[in-house]
UniProtKB/Swiss-Prot annotation:
Subunit structure comment from the entry: Interacts with ARRB2.
Principal subcellular localization: cytoplasm
Modified residues (Phosphoserine): 446, 501
Lineage: Eukaryota, Metazoa, Chordata, Craniata, Vertebrata
Protein known as: Dual specificity protein phosphatase 16
Length: 665
């Protein structure tokens, strides 16, 4: 507040501070005519009207000023010469502007003879009522004054509603029974020593905070008790009025403290909140400093549990936020939507660890549809991670005469695509899909070296699953058609493949030791082979996989520990030592008892392994019409190879391979 006193002149802010503090007795004298006084005046002001008769009697000393004060006061006033006296009229600014024969000049002269401190209110009642309408009372509800500050209300009629159960007002409001009943106020918190308790308020609904508006009062010890009293009124569905003399400093301090504690606001936020509701509030600096201490006290009480509850609330709001997975190396990594390809070591590690089918978790329902919809071309082009090798992948040439529409990834390839460091991590990620029928119709990983081709197109005869099941019980008796893989599943599953050898056949692929491209026969081909009674000759009859699959598994290659599962396409382009970008694990030797493969004896002369075109049967010609030529311009080495090594061995790694896929059109 701006405190200013010039001679016998006092400003309105200083007068309000004196009235709020209560430390000094202030005698207010209204020198206006009685009609104006009766209309509106400052609280507790005494009217000494400026009639000509009263002026003459004062000038002739026919009446004492003290007697005139007692006569004009509504109740007995203790006259003390040491108390301050403030006189005001309608709009006088200072004593110098007054004429010598006016009533106000005569009144001030007589008061100075009886009291030590006499002051004239600058601006008079007009200025005071404009700045502090809440401290004015009278019969009229509105004070006809000029408004120069739009931020302040014209008149504060009644208490101010801060919250639904909290009102802030002055002494005039609490003494107005009708106004209190209209607002439903049944509790009163009186923050003063002098303001009386209303008669219509019971003692149990009344609380007095005996503090004065001064710079030495302690209001902090009363704040918690005041907050509890307001909460008591709220619990009883009642409204409480917090008031002092003017509703500016003491009562505003208590209201701000309540907002701070119950609405979890800082001092600045609570002050602005109350200021917007009641612009006339102005706690003194002493109370503001104690509110700062109260803010620290609240933070100390709720500091331990506050941040925890907020973090917990934040976590409950985001339950679907992806949680980063921690790999074996201790680094955090999130599962991407388009998983990158891992190195060949991961594929080999996944290929050497057999897992029991019962221990394989289920595949997420989103993943099979994502994999089935992806074409083989995207699978081959997405084998590389680094952006600088994209131009190398563009050199990869492939041409298919068959319309291969989709490909199913194996668990080892999917594990490398998703960036899993081991096969255990991949098996925990992939779980059985609920969309497939049966327990043995899911994409699983197994070290069993049984390969089969699933034709991407539906069979011409539209065979059902019951036909291949008969093939498993009644197999062809012909010796050539019995050249099948005998699969033996080991329960321990820990045997390591010490020697790897390819399946030799005529052609340029035979000369390459590191990679073998193996394809079997589809279910329809096996059925036609049995019904025709023909034995396939040449390398086509090396592998006849006695497996079957439901139509839902058409156009996909699977593999598992049982004979009803297959290798996926990644087994063909997956993890050999030299061509890790394309090939997978090779066939084991016959010496390995765990992975035994029965195949025909390789002829000594490679030229005799294939006959001329006119010597072949029409059945074989029909199979050989459908061929797939795969030409690889340049093989891409594994990711851990440096570019220098790639330049050295680039000429040796390029090869041209032809492979034939047998299919019944």
């Amino acid at each position: 507040m701006a405190h200013e006193m010039i001679g016998t002149q006092i400003v309105t802010e200083r007068l309000v501070a004196l009235l709020e503090s209560g430390t000094e007795k202030v005698l207010l004298i209204d020198s206006r005519p009685f009609v104006e006084y009766n209309t509106s005046h400052i609280l507790e002001a005494i009217n000494i009207n400026c009639s000509k008769l009263m002026k003459r009697r004062l000038q002739q000393d026919k009446v004492l000023i003290t007697e005139l004060i007692q006569h004009s006061a509504k109740h007995k006033v203790d006259i003390d010469c040491s108390q301050k006296v403030v006189v005001y009229d309608q709009s006088s600014q200072d004593v110098a502007s007054l004429s010598s024969d006016c009533f106000l000049t005569v009144l001030l002269g007589k008061l100075e003879k009886s009291f030590n401190s006499v002051h004239l209110l600058a601006g008079g009642f007009a200025e005071f009522s404009r700045c502090f309408p809440g401290l004015c009372e009278g019969k009229s509800t509105l004070v006809p004054t000029c408004i120069s500050q739009p931020c302040l209300p014209v008149a504060n009629i009644g208490p101010t509603r801060i919250l639904p159960n909290l009102y802030l007002g002055c002494q005039r409001d609490v003494l107005n029974k009708e106004l209190m009943q209209q607002n439903g106020i049944g509790y009163v918190l009186n923050a003063s020593n002098t303001c009386p308790k209303p008669d219509f308020i019971p003692e149990s609904h009344f609380l007095r905070v005996p503090v004065n508006d001064s710079f030495c009062e302690k209001i902090l010890p009363w704040l918690d008790k005041s907050v509890d009293f307001i909460e008591k009124a709220k619990a009883s569905n009642g409204c409480v009025l917090v008031h002092c003399l003017a509703g500016i400093s003491r009562s505003a301090t208590i209201a701000i403290a309540y907002i701070m504690k119950r609405m979890d606001m800082s001092l600045d936020e609570a002050y602005r909140f109350v200021k917007e509701k009641r612009p006339t509030i102005s706690p003194n600096f002493n109370f503001l400093g104690q509110l700062l201490d109260y803010e620290k006290k609240i933070k100390n009480q709720t500091g331990a549990s506050g941040p925890k509850s907020k973090l917990k609330l934040l976590h409950l709001e985001k339950p679907n936020e992806p949680v980063p997975a921690v790999s074996e190396g201790g680094q955090k990594s999130e599962t991407p939507l388009s998983p990158p390809c891992a190195d060949s070591a991961t594929s080999e590690a996944a290929g050497q660890r057999p897992v029991h089918p019962a221990s394989v978790p289920s595949v997420p329902s989103v993943q099979p549809s994502l994999l089935e919809d992806s074409p083989l071309v995207q699978a081959l082009s997405g084998l590389h991670l680094s952006a600088d090798r994209l131009e190398d992948s563009n050199k990869l040439k492939r041409s298919f005469s068959l319309d291969i529409k989709s490909v199913s990834y194996s668990a080892s390839m999917a594990a490398s695509l998703h960036g899993f460091s081991s096969s255990e991590d991949a098996l925990e990620y992939y779980k059985p899909s609920t969309t497939l029928d049966g327990t043995n119709k899911l994409c699983q990983f197994s070290p069993v070296q049984e390969l089969s081709e699933q034709t991407p197109e539906t069979s011409p005869d539209k065979e059902e699953a019951s036909i291949p099941k008969k093939l498993q019980t009644a197999r062809p008796s012909d010796s050539q058609s019995k050249r099948l893989h005998s699969v033996r599943t080991s329960s321990s599953g820990t045997a390591q493949r010490s020697l790897l050898s390819p399946l030799h056949r005529s052609g340029s692929v035979e000369d390459n030791y590191h990679t073998s491209f193996l394809f079997g026969l589809s279910t329809s081909q096996q059925h036609l082979t049995k019904s025709a009674g023909l034995g396939l000759k040449g390398w086509h009859s090396d592998i006849l996989a006695p497996q079957t699959s439901t139509p839902s598994l058409t156009s996909s290659w699977y593999f598992a520990t049982e004979s009803s599962h297959f290798y996926s396409a990644s087994a063909i382009y997956g993890g050999s030592a030299s061509y890790s970008a394309y090939s997978c694990s090779q066939l084991p030797t016959c010496g390995d008892q765990v992975y035994s493969v029965r195949r025909r004896q390789k002829p000594s002369d490679r030229a005799d392994s294939r006959r001329s075109w006119h010597e072949e049967s029409p059945f074989e010609k029909q199979f050989k019409r459908r061929s797939c030529q795969m030409e690889f311009g340049e093989s891409i080495m594994s990711e851990n190879r440096s570019r220098e090594e790639l330049g050295k061995v680039g000429s040796q790694s390029s090869f041209s391979g032809s492979m034939e896929i047998i299919e019944v059109s």
